[in-house]
A protein has these predicted regions:
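GIY-YIG nuclease catalytic motif and its immediate N-terminal context
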Residues: 1-44, 48-53, 58-68, 72, ...
Length: 83
């Protein structure tokens, strides 16, 4: 069974976090670090800060959007990561 992931990357160049979702986490991080995401290629390299695994793409996408749209949920997660 495939898993789907929601992930948080941190730029090693700037104080910037990127939230995304994917089925292949390793490949997606490589794509980010190869500059294949135009909107953030100027911020490479990235390191994986956090991820969550889900059984369906729908659940992963729902969580990704929740983190991107809900500043409280995002802040709550980032506060936990900083401990």
């Amino acid at each position: 069974m495939s898993m789907f992931y929601v992930y948080v990357l941190k730029s090693e160049r700037a104080e910037y976090h990127y939230i995304g979702s994917t089925e292949d986490l390793k490949k997606r991080i490589q794509e980010h670090n190869q500059g294949k995401t135009k909107s953030i290629k100027h911020l490479v390299p990235f390191k994986l800060l956090y991820y969550e695994a889900y059984e369906t793409r729908t659940l992963a996408r729902k969580r990704e959007l929740e983190l991107k749209r809900n500043s409280f949920k995002k802040k709550e997660l980032f506060d936990r990561l900083e401990r």
